[in-house]
């Protein structure tokens, strides 16, 4: 037993001095080492150490390709002057700000899939699809697979990538209609063992790029529940965007990076060099402006040096002067972001946050409510929707909006592969603002002294989950 404790101490010292990790997460792991001395180090080695991250980064060939193509696009594109609030982030993330885009806000699954199907039917060259959850055994999944198969038969190059962990029951055979039609289907970390080992590094992005000209991203996956068909979580509120313009090229580059990663994992099915050459031809800049909206595409995860989405949100929060509205299914962002929200509210900014009233994961919901308590005490207004909120949006001052795949939590900001679009446009921001205020009509505001009104055991439960929140 003494040997085990010495081993725990050595791991703890390494965690403290050599791992770039959130302080609260570090404290949680040290407590686990202390109270679970045998299994603690094993869990850490499997799920949180840099070893698995090192394995992923070594195999993630797409990162270097993404950097190269982004530099090429930056040189080709006559860069617009980015707003002062994000100039530092443009430089840090090395993804240029483009100002010739048209972005349409899609506020539910019905609208998103209706527009998506229309665009897919017009595809003539390529369709690239990436989802965390893609369930071809459900109605919307079957419809989409059938349409993709039809386009593949017409000679359109169709690539589909999904994450195994999103729907563990889904198998490759469920995509046979598309595969037999000539489409390519791949899985991110396909084996059950690899999915469990890499549970902390999930491909949480949602992205469709059509002919290199139109792109969709946001919170909506391909499953019936995203159309409000899950009676346990209805109504379902979600948000996606449809994009045309130069920003689509950067989204195409991101798909390319993720696709090349799975090609490296499945060399028996792919010639990676050929796949790269074909995908490079799909990275296109528009011949004419699609619109006048400014957009920056951000990605983060094990394949990026820094948490670019989190850092951008920090900057946007600090720049807000009048109002800041946030929608998120989970509110576990870490103390830095919580402090920034409190400071913004104390500075006179109208800070409001909309979270679900119906949880999908109860332990995460308890952590969300626990993080809400200190914000409520300091004046931040927080609402619970009568249904399930899966939208991941931020809007400030009728100037800037963000719509993406990243939840307002540590897992999205630091662990999973995520994607966000930051839109600088007054009309789009007003549309996001109005959508948020409309959602509040179906929501209940939490009281500032909410914590005093719940029972003793509920307070203990929420306190515990807030403590371990950085690990969720």
Model region roles, listed by residue range:
Residues 239, 327-328:
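A short, conserved beta-strand element enriched in hydrophobic/aromatic residues
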Residues 1-311, 315, 319, 359, ...:
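N-terminal localization/anchoring segments of enzymes in phospholipid and broader phosphate metabolism
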Residues 349-409:
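C-terminal structural cap/anchor segments
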Residues 340-343, 370, 437:
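Short, solvent-exposed amphipathic alpha-helical segments in soluble enzyme
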Residues 323:
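Phosphate-/nucleic-acid-contacting segments
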Residues 163, 329-330, 364:
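Glycine- and other small-residue-rich loops at beta-strand/loop junctions that grip anionic moieties
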Residues 330-351, 356, 361:
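Helical hairpin unit composed of two closely spaced alpha helices linked by a short loop
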